[in-house]
Curated annotation (Swiss-Prot):
Matches recorded under InterPro entries: OPRT (IPR023031), Or_phspho_trans_dom (IPR004467), PRibTrfase_dom (IPR000836), PRTase-like (IPR029057)
Organism listed in the record: Methanocella arvoryzae (strain DSM 22066 / NBRC 105507 / MRE50)
Cofactor(s) this protein cannot do without: Mg(2+)
Subunit and interaction comment: Homodimer.
Descriptive protein name: Orotate phosphoribosyltransferase
The family this protein is said to belong to: Belongs to the purine/pyrimidine phosphoribosyltransferase family. PyrE subfamily.
GO biological process: one example: 'de novo' UMP biosynthetic process
List of residues binding orotate: 118, 146
Gene: pyrE
Catalytic reaction list: orotidine 5'-phosphate + diphosphate = orotate + 5-phospho-alpha-D-ribose 1-diphosphate
Length: 175
């Protein structure tokens, strides 16, 4: 368990308790507010360091998923020197009209960066987009794994999931 990061997420107020509806539609008694840890420079820097250390050998690009994991991919890119791309959920209808923004080449190995994994619907959509474009994705990282089936869904798609923190660690840790 990464005690420093668990404490940081709690101390910044990123872990909230109450009645919440998650993006999946599920109800929960706790919420991990990614915008709290993504907008705190100290927390973001620590997360970037952690992600940079997990980048698998042979990786050519990181991938951030619109909108939530873009700051995470950006800081990990800065910390590691590894370029990144942005994966959109849908084309904008103007400009370049791309689903994958940034520079990349078919066949490159990509390490997907995600904020919070619950059902993994967003991560799976991004992985399918990357694979359809000819990029190789077999590993990803998330800051928090809520341990609600997302990891298993990703593994069924052949994607190894690394998490910086698991919900059981967040909820069970007492300093």
């Amino acid at each position: 368990m990464d005690t420093e990061l668990v404490e940081m997420l709690k101390q910044t107020g990123a872990v909230k308790f109450g009645d919440f509806t998650l993006s999946s539609g599920r109800k929960s008694t706790y919420y991990v507010d990614k915008y709290i840890f993504e907008t705190n420079p100290v927390c973001l820097s620590v997360i970037g360091d952690r992600i940079a250390k997990l980048i698998p050998a042979g990786t050519r690009r990181l991938a951030g998923i619109e909108i939530g994991s873009i700051p995470l991919a950006a800081v990990a890119s800065v910390k590691s020197g590894m370029p990144f791309v942005v994966v959109r959920k849908a084309t904008k209808g103007y400009g370049t009209n791309k689903l994958i923004e940034g520079v990349w080449q078919k066949g490159e190995k990509v390490f997907v960066v995600e904020d919070v994994v619950t059902t993994a619907r967003g991560a799976l959509g991004a992985i399918h987009t990357l694979r359809e474009a000819g990029l190789a994705v077999d590993e990803m990282v998330c800051v928090v794994d809520r341990e609600e089936g997302g990891r298993e869904s990703l593994e069924q798609e052949g994607v190894k999931v690394r998490s910086l923190v698991k919900s059981s660690e967040l909820l069970g840790y007492k300093p």
